[in-house]
């Protein structure tokens, strides 16, 4: 049935045999306060996020692991997009999968309905747990305490969905995690409602492909992404000449990443464009010190309307040391 559904939905059928076991712990969740959907995962396997984690705004999220069939991701989303609940979608896919006993899958739909499956032949310790609008699942773990610890950590964590997903991963690692160690991790968070532009609906879409401490690196990337999200919002404010908004967003980015030269530079450009050169001076100085080529970029901006065509202003910026 999985192969038939794939053909009906225009997807190629999965391979006849299962892939190698992607020993994994993951969490799939919907934030009841914002409606955001997300998946976070860690594994002793290269590039775990490229096959395990799937999410679509306004539809649902899927983690497919163990002897992985990646088709559960797009097929699960297709079924949920068509109106099936996460439990119904997972049941339908498992019913037609002759290798269901080696699969481990978690799904949550846009209404928060959740389901998890751990096949009888998943390598132990393996299991899953369903909570309110989330599921956790793990296989090839050091101890069977991993997934209950994930659930407790997620429920107790503060912050937004990304914060809570990361807390669940940290709790899994604290319980021993994958019996073989750690290698890669990923997180994807999408907005509650689809804009019709999938690229604009992803709040986080980050992977650590190969790292001795993937969860540490994933947290670093999440923090950096938060800063860039503020930078993007600042750019949007600049586009409509809302300078107060731009300063607020660029300032938030700088608070998160105070040593980041590019963030300092564009914040300075926004200030200078708004007629506030004095507070822009230390920001330009930071960028120029990091790399003198930022000075050359200043010269190029007025011609493309990214700085006022004001020679005195440009000269004043270039004179900053």
What are these model-derived regions, one by one?
Residues 1-10:
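Bacterial N-terminal signal peptides
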Residues 16-180, 187, 209-240, 255:
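Alpha/propeptide regions of enzymes that mature by internal proteolysis
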Residues 235-236, 269, 302-303:
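Residue-level recognition of tetratricopeptide repeat
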Residues 239, 273-274, 307:
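Register position in tetratricopeptide repeats
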Residues 258, 289-293:
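Short coil turns that delineate tetratricopeptide repeat
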Residues 263, 297-298:
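TPR alpha-solenoid repeat register
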């Amino acid at each position: 049935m999985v192969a038939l559904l794939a053909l009906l939905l225009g997807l190629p059928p999965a391979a006849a045999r299962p892939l190698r076991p992607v020993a994994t712990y993951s969490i799939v969740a919907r934030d009841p306060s914002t409606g955001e959907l997300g998946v976070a995962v860690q594994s002793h396997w290269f590039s775990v996020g490229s096959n395990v984690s799937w999410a679509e705004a306004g539809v649902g999220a899927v983690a497919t692991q163990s002897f992985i069939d990646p088709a559960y991701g797009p097929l699960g989303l297709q079924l949920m997009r068509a109106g099936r609940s996460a439990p119904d979608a997972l049941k339908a896919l498992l019913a037609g999968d002759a290798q269901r006993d080696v699969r481990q899958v978690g799904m949550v739909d846009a209404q928060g309905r959740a389901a998890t499956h751990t096949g009888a032949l998943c390598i132990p310790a393996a299991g899953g747990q369903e909570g309110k609008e989330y599921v956790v699942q793990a296989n090839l773990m050091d101890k069977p305490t991993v997934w209950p610890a994930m659930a407790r950590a997620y429920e107790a964590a503060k912050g937004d969905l990304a914060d809570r997903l990361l807390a669940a991963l940290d709790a899994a690692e604290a319980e021993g995690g994958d019996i073989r160690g750690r290698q890669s991790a990923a997180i994807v968070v999408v907005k509650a409602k689809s804009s019709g532009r999938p690229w604009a609906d992803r709040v986080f879409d980050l992977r650590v492909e190969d790292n001795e401490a993937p969860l540490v690196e994933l947290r670093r990337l999440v923090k950096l992404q938060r800063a860039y999200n503020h930078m993007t919002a600042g750019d949007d404010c600049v586009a409509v000449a809302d300078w107060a908004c731009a300063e607020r967003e660029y300032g938030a980015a700088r608070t998160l990443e105070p040593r980041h030269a590019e963030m300092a530079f564009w914040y300075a450009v926004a200030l200078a464009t708004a007629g506030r050169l004095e507070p822009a001076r230390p920001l330009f100085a930071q960028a120029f010190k990091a790399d003198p080529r930022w000075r050359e970029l200043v010269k190029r901006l007025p011609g493309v309307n990214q700085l006022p065509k004001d020679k005195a202003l440009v000269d004043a910026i270039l004179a900053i040391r």
